[in-house]
């Protein structure tokens, strides 16, 4: 939602009903796994996304800051936070306010800890899944760089295989 701008994004992530629209477009199916990331874990959209996915039989994993979420009240009508509705909760250890540095003399924080922590965690999950494929004697379905010889051809095969399930590939 950040593509709409920071102020609009903040308003949208607190509105009910948006998550349902997004999740319906995703085409989730029972047995899928959904990874959600929300540093505070208190806004309506991520909580609704998790609840929607669970109703569909999807396994839901979230990355959140337990330090932040434990100090804040949910904005979801149920009063639940993201960590309350997910199957697995991974703590990104970001501090309340999400800043790594305090601006001297002003008290504001900067350097989004959740950006660094959550991206690292998500990439580790991907690497672990790829290793699981390899241990099972399978080739992980990973796109090649389009800027290396044969990359486009290899990627076309993967796109054709997965485009019905992953709309972003269409």
Residue ranges: model-predicted function:
Residues 1-126:
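Glycine-rich phosphate-binding loops that contact phosphosugars or nucleotide phosphates
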Residues 104-170:
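YjeF_N-associated NAD(P)HX repair module
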